[in-house]
């Protein structure tokens, strides 16, 4: 069995199982676990110290599913422009199998089966312990890493995913892993991110790209967000809700150069 080893355990989140469980417990502290009919979500992927509590706002609402599809931006530049992983993923909390039926449905499309893009990438990996902490029953994942994030590509991937999910009859939740504005003041980050988030909440994909380019916004997972919105809408999603917005300065105290984080769900 081919295994995708953790790349950022001990960096973005604790390496040891017990310590990781304690950190996840801290992230969910004060949140009510209330499952909703969530089809898609936007979730941050920074170190748990900074964005874990924001991410927990999403995971506290997620329903049980057969498969959790996770779109992540490719920060490393390795691998195919858009790649799906077929390997089993290992975390300090255990192993998670990939939904090979859905993964193989992409073969022959714009999405390649390629492990290199996933090997060192953190954006998908950091979501997995949250799923393992929340759900005891077996579930599978579909990790899709996007180096090519233009609107046409992301919409095509989202439409294809929605068709595959519909044909499979499986219950799936689609997660777009993305941080928002990077290394601006807290005030400016919130100003830029508010515009981008407004487009997301209105399912206005073209408007989001326009605002990203016009504001030179450093949102890293706009392709994953677009693919998630496209697929969720095609599967019946009609309402998007911002659950939480914060920035790294809320933890570090440094408001001069922050990273923005948003928790958004689509129902």
Swiss-Prot record:
Tree of life domain: Archaea
InterPro entries, sorted: MEMO1_fam
UniProt xrefs under Gene3D superfamilies: LigB-like (3.40.830.10)
Family designation: Belongs to the MEMO1 family.
Protein name as catalogued: MEMO1 family protein MM_1761
Gene source species: Methanosarcina mazei (strain ATCC BAA-159 / DSM 3647 / Goe1 / Go1 / JCM 11833 / OCM 88)
Organism lineage: Archaea, Methanobacteriati, Methanobacteriota, Stenosarchaea group, Methanomicrobia
């Amino acid at each position: 069995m081919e295994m995708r080893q953790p790349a950022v355990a001990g960096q973005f989140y604790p390496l040891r199982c017990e310590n990781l469980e304690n950190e996840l417990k801290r992230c969910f502290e004060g949140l009510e676990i209330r499952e909703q009919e969530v089809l898609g979500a936007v979730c941050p992927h920074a170190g748990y110290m900074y964005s874990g509590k924001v991410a927990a706002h999403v995971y506290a609402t997620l329903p049980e599913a057969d498969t959790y599809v996770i779109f992540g931006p490719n920060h490393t530049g390795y691998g195919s422009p858009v790649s799906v992983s077929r390997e089993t993923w290992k975390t300090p909390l255990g192993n998670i199998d990939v939904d090979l039926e859905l993964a193989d449905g992409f073969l022959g499309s714009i999405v390649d089966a390629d492990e290199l893009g996933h090997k060192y990438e953190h954006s998908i990996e950091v979501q997995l312990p949250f799923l393992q902490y929340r759900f005891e029953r077996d579930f599978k994942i579909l990790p899709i890493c996007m180096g090519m994030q233009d609107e046409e590509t992301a919409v095509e991937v989202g439409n294809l995913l929605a068709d595959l999910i519909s044909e499979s009859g499986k219950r799936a939740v689609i997660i777009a892993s993305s941080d928002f504005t990077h290394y601006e003041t807290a005030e400016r980050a919130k100003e830029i991110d508010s515009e981008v988030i407004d487009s997301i909440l209105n399912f206005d994909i073209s408007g989001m790209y326009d605002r990203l380019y016009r504001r030179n916004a450093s949102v890293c997972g706009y392709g994953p967000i677009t693919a998630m919105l496209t697929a969720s809408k095609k599967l019946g999603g009609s309402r998007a809700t911002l659950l939480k917005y914060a920035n790294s300065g809320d933890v570090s105290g440094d408001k001069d150069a922050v990273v923005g984080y948003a928790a958004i769900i689509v129902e």
